[in-house]
Amino acid sequence: DIHGMLDCAKIADIVILVIDARKGMELETFEFLNMLQVHGFPIVIGILTHMDSFRRNKHLQKAQKQIKERFWKEIYTGAKMHFLSGILPSGRYLDREIRAIARNLASTRKRLLSFRSSHSYVVADRLEDLTPPHLVTADPGMDRTAAVYGYVRGTYMHPGRELYIP
């Protein structure tokens, strides 16, 4: 969903890109990275999955190297990338791999992005339609009144300002 990716790119402080090692970086990944660049480019962490699908260690290392080099080319050299070797019979990933990702997330400091600090936006919890139902059934194309509940982030939001709701 391109609209969801765009909304996420506008508000994300840290992005975790999960990449399937069998397929590599797909078109949607590059589109999302482009959206992130336009909206301030937050911190991006890559996670490479399905490493257990490679039968030979040589093919695994080659795929890791190619994807890591492409990841660094798109983001920056040295960008953090983690590898998940495979799912255990219990349906979970290895604890040490998950701990490494959690440690990286906990120690990462978020940057103040100029786009977000100069534009106000709402992270909405819920949206309620306040228009009486009998008016909506009479004229389905009418303008409606809605209440948005959530958090205002960025700069001050002026009363009466028009909003874009995806």
Model-derived features: positions:
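Canonical P-loop GTPase G-domain recognition
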Residues: 43-45, 52-140, 144-153, 159
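Short secondary-structure capping/turn segments at boundaries of alpha-helices and beta-strands
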Residues: 2-5, 160
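Conserved Switch II/interswitch segment of TRAFAC-class P-loop GTPases
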Residues: 1-2, 10-31, 41-61
